Amino acid sequence: VQDFVAAWKADPAKVTIGGGSSPGGPDHLFPMETAKAAGVDPTKVNYVSYDGGGDLLTALLGNKITAGTSGLGEYVDQIESGQVRVLAVSGDERVEGVDAPTLTQAGIDLTFTNWRGVLAPPGISDEDKQAMVKVLEELHATDAWKEALVKNGWSDAFMTGPAFESFLNEQDTRVETTLTDLGLV
């Protein structure tokens, strides 16, 4: 990680970072926030947007980009075969079976997760909302949920109600700040 950051600081435009999302998406926001935390000017980051993980992997394996950002679950086979090397993981904890530090352990003060949520339309009744939450809580308690977390290298960040609402507000602020810093908002 230190060698990568040193090269990035020396010439941010030369270090190409690929991601499977358009500007504003998680694969774009992550390297921008990483750059800022590592002391690289995010406006100088050379981000290449690909149409999903398959195109990103092709570019990475073909040496068209310096590094890529994606979920571990998308590239398990390539990681296990040694075709792709994980420099760091962006969650709070190391991922079991992956020989890579967290960004924080590597000296970059950043945690970044690509979360998923279940949202309902405005005006949903309290009864329907509680029924949805109950189903999600039941799913969360299953072995299948736990197995999916391990299989995909995901962190269990399950939350509902006010905790999830607070998280969404924090995410809105974080994204707006990053996009504003980049001059995109």
Locate the predicted segments by residue:
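Ligand-binding clamshell of periplasmic/extracellular solute-binding protein-like
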Residues: 1, 68-78
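Hinge/capping helix and adjacent helix->loop/strand transition within the periplasmic-binding protein
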Residues: 1-55, 115-148
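Alpha-to-beta junction loops
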Residues: 11-15, 61-70, 83-86, 173-174
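Short helix-initiation/N-cap motifs at beta->coil->alpha
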Residues: 46-58, 71-74, 162
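Well-formed, non-transmembrane alpha-helical positions, independent of function
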Residues: 3, 58-59, 77-78, 102, ...
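C-terminal lobe and pocket-closing loops
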Residues: 74-141, 170-173
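Conserved functional loop/turn residues at catalytic and ligand-binding sites
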Residues: 63-64, 83, 107, 153, ...
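An extracytoplasmic/periplasmic, membrane-proximal ligand-sensing/linker region
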Residues: 38, 80, 102, 126-185
